[in-house]
């Protein structure tokens, strides 16, 4: 059964592959020559030999044909196995996956004529199976591949822009600084680095036919959210046992593998920093009874340190057991070394959030109703992002066979994958009420300064600025929403003009007021 991966590479990876498969290697190949063959060429040839062996075994094991009338004998056509077929019947099978330019979702046909003989091609007068639909490089598929390719570039570019803007906001406005924002900034950094790596891959590796064609890769992930398919984005080149050889120690091959190594590492960091967000909220709300004094070094260790372990193990095992160029093939279970921990992090985070919601709902029904409500609002962003970022691992393991639904699936799946950084920045920063109020306040101050510069009448600063402060974190219903839970750094003064830290209304104010 084909390996189902989880790799958010992205991979939509429209690799430039257009090999013409060669079924038989020259007879004069030596063992040393075989070692230099493209790795995935050997994998495809092994699949073909396995299928041939199973076919001949099946031909021997099946009972004789018991139908009436003429029929075509079971046979091996060189690529696939065909059972006994009644005369006048067209048999169909899915295309094989031996070759990167074959589309396994398409069908192969073989016709048994009325005389009980397999159809012969008029040009060669030899029995013939129709593999023409297996071509993965049809104009429609190429067009779809180009669209997905540019969708990935746009998605990661927008993600980088949105994440850098969010990082700038959190760094510039000191009143937004707290432990949870520190977690946000680290998670933003992982998404920025991951998007940069993917863009480099799409720009430098994908168009590099000399590198990619030498070891054809399956492009779209056929794992929980991907499906294997090959696309060609440049003129075809043949692939044989001798053509397309590339020294595994070539600098391009090494650079490509290093790039993929860091992509896998950053992808894992994405999800483990999301887990840090969930652990932080769970500790803050469930374990510590609404206290925020937590040591962040353990979060740094989990978010940056732990993902390097499975990434290194994957790199070593991949180099030893499945050393294809760039390590992009999804036809190996070794990818579970990385994606297993990622799935575990998503599951743990999901249960953390369920427990957080349970605790908050209980508190809202009993005591601390206002504060519990505010924490529930603070948890809302993580509650949205965890299923959003993990949906491709859980909800979309199967691509619809219908062509229209399949295209809708492709665009939806790739939008979720390649715009993840944009979603993270939007939900954690741009949609946060506290950030919006801070930006509005800054804009109001800018307009005052601009008006004063041009000689307009300057209105009293305390009236313009303090008004937003008074309602800075208020939402309909009178309950604020916060990024942070922190104590004021100095007592507020009567004119509401203290240090910037006093603008952060602490979470426990409501509890103190209610107990007074």
Curated annotation (Swiss-Prot):
Residues 489-516 are annotated as: Disordered. Gene3D superfamilies: GPCR, family 2, extracellular hormone receptor domain, Rhodopsin 7-helix transmembrane proteins. Keywords: Cell membrane, Disulfide bond, G-protein coupled receptor, Glycoprotein, Membrane, Receptor, Signal, Transducer, Transmembrane, Transmembrane helix. It comes from Rattus norvegicus. CDD domains: 7tmB1_calcitonin_R. Belongs to the G-protein coupled receptor 2 family. InterPro entries: GPCR_2, GPCR_2-like_7TM, GPCR_2_calcitonin_rcpt, GPCR_2_calcitonin_rcpt_fam, GPCR_2_extracell_dom_sf, GPCR_2_extracellular_dom, GPCR_2_secretin-like, GPCR_2_secretin-like_CS. Residues 25-146, 203-256, 318-333, 397-404 are extracellular. This is Calcitonin receptor. It is found in: Cell membrane. GO terms for cellular component: acrosomal vesicle; amylin receptor complex 1; amylin receptor complex 2; amylin receptor complex 3; axon; cilium; neuronal cell body; plasma membrane. Heterodimer of CALCR and RAMP1, RAMP2 or RAMP3; the receptor complexes function as AMYR1, AMYR2 and AMYR3 receptors, respectively, and respond to amylin/IAPP, calcitonin/CT and CGRP1 ligands. Interacts with GPRASP2.
């Amino acid at each position: 059964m084909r390996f189902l991966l989880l790799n958010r590479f992205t991979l939509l990876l429209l690799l430039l592959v257009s090999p013409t498969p060669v079924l038989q290697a020259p007879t004069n190949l030596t063992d040393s020559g075989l070692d230099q063959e493209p790795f995935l060429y050997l994998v495809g040839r092994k699949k073909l030999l396995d299928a041939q062996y199973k076919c001949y075994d099946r031909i021997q094991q099946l009972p004789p044909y018991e139908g009436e009338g003429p029929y075509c004998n079971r046979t091996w056509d060189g690529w696939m196995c065909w059972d006994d077929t009644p005369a006048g019947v067209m048999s169909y099978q899915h295309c094989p996956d031996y070759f990167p330019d074959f589309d396994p979702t398409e069908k192969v046909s073989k016709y048994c004529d009325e005389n009980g003989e397999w159809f012969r091609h008029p040009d060669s007068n030899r029995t013939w199976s129709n593999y023409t639909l297996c071509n993965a490089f049809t104009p429609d598929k190429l067009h779809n591949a180009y669209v997905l390719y540019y969708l990935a570039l746009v998605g990661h570019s927008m993600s980088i822009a949105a994440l850098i803007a969010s990082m700038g906001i959190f760094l510039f406005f000191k009143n937004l600084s707290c432990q949870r924002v520190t977690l946000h900034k680290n998670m933003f950094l992982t998404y920025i680095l991951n998007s940069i790596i993917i863009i480099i891959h799409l720009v430098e590796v994908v168009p590099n036919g000399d590198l990619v064609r030498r070891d054809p890769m399956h492009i779209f992930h056929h794992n929980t959210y991907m499906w294997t398919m090959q696309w060609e984005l440049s003129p075809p080149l043949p692939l044989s046992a001798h053509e397309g050889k590339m020294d595994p120690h070539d600098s391009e091959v090494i650079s490509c593998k290093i790039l993929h190594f860091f992509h896998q590492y950053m992808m894992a960091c994405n999800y483990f920093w999301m887990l840090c967000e969930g652990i932080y909220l769970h500790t803050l709300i469930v374990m510590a009874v609404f206290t925020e004094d937590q040591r962040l070094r353990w979060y740094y260790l989990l978010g940056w340190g732990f993902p390097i372990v499975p990434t290194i193990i994957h790199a070593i095992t991949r180099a030893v057991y499945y050393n294809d160029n760039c390590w992009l093939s999804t036809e190996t279970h070794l990818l579970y070394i990385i994606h297993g921990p990622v799935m575990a992090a998503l599951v743990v985070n999901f249960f953390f959030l369920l427990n957080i919601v349970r605790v908050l709902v209980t508190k809202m029904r009993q005591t601390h109703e206002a504060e519990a409500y505010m924490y529930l609002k603070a948890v809302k962003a993580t509650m949205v992002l965890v299923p959003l970022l993990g949906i491709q691992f859980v909800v979309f393991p199967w691509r619809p066979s219908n062509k229209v639904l399949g295209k809708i699936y492709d665009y939806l799946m790739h939008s979720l994958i390649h715009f993840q950084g944009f979603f993270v920045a939007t939900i954690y920063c741009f949609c946060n009420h506290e950030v919006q109020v801070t930006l509005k306040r800054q804009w109001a101050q800018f307009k005052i300064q601009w008006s004063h510069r041009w000689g307009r009448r300057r209105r009293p600063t305390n009236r313009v600025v303090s008004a937003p402060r008074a309602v800075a974190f208020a939402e309909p219903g009178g309950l604020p929403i916060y990024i942070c839970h922190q104590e004021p750094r100095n007592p507020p003064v009567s004119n509401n003009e203290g240090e910037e830290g006093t603008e952060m209304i602490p979470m426990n104010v409501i509890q103190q007021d209610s107990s007074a």
